[in-house]
């Protein structure tokens, strides 16, 4: 199953249509709408049809200290080895078979096993290598040396990180990836620190919200949203011709 958000919850409908400012850690409106709601709706449908659901996830403690802490916190509620209750959805469990694997464990398995849907895993390795700054993907025993598993792929519009290092490296290391340059430029322009000159004081309802008797900036202005739409369409046209 390929899950997608409802049209009213898609990224550009909210940013251009409703004028939501680019996501920030204090206003992270994207994750709930784009990822969590579609997933939860699908899981609830499975539970209704079958009485329960088990999610098989590739989450690993080695991904980050935050991920390790969250996973270890849930271990006390396990019903059996690697099988934990889903805290947000009743009658659903989370199975994490590779939770203790390192990055190198993952790559060693992929290089030694065939892909069930027919793609060559070496192409995947090459893609991760291209997303690293030195264009390499070493399998290492020295934990101070980063492996290619540290390359991260998320939404190309993501403004929750300072820089999209993976996309930048892919463009730099591979001429065939230069078609992504308009996307990177658009993403970087969305990620401006001070966007107050692009935003209106009025909410969609027409109301003005105050904080200590001073108006708070609200959605993007109509002119700003028109500019984002024009630039997005220009990037789309260029990519269709050159990508």
For every predicted segment, state its role:
Residues 1-243:
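Nucleotide-activated chemistry modules centered on ATP-dependent adenylation/adenylyltransferase
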């Amino acid at each position: 199953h390929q899950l997608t958000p409802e049209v009213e919850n898609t990224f550009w409908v909210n940013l251009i249509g409703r004028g939501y400012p680019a996501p920030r850690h204090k206003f992270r409106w994207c994750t709930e709408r784009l990822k969590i709601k579609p997933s939860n709706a699908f899981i609830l449908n499975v539970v209704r049809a079958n009485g329960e659901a088990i999610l098989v996830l590739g989450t690993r403690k080695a991904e980050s200290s935050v991920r390790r802490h969250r996973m270890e916190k849930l271990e006390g509620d396990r019903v059996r080895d690697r099988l934990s209750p889903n805290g947000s959805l009743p009658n659903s469990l989370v199975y994490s078979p590779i939770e203790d694997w390192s990055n190198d464990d993952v790559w060693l398995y992929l290089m030694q096993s065939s892909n069930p849907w027919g793609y060559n895993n070496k192409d995947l390795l090459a893609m991760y290598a291209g997303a690293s700054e030195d264009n390499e993907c070493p399998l290492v025993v020295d934990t101070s040396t980063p492996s290619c598993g540290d390359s991260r792929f998320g939404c190309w519009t993501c403004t929750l990180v300072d820089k999209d290092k993976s996309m930048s490296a892919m463009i730099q290391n591979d001429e065939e990836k230069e078609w992504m340059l308009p996307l990177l430029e658009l993403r970087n322009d969305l990620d401006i620190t001070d966007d107050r000159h692009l935003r209106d004081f009025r909410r969609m309802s027409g109301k003005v919200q105050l904080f200590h008797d001073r108006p708070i900036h609200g959605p993007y202005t109509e002119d700003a949203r028109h500019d984002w739409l024009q630039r997005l369409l220009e990037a789309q046209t260029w990519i269709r011709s050159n990508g």
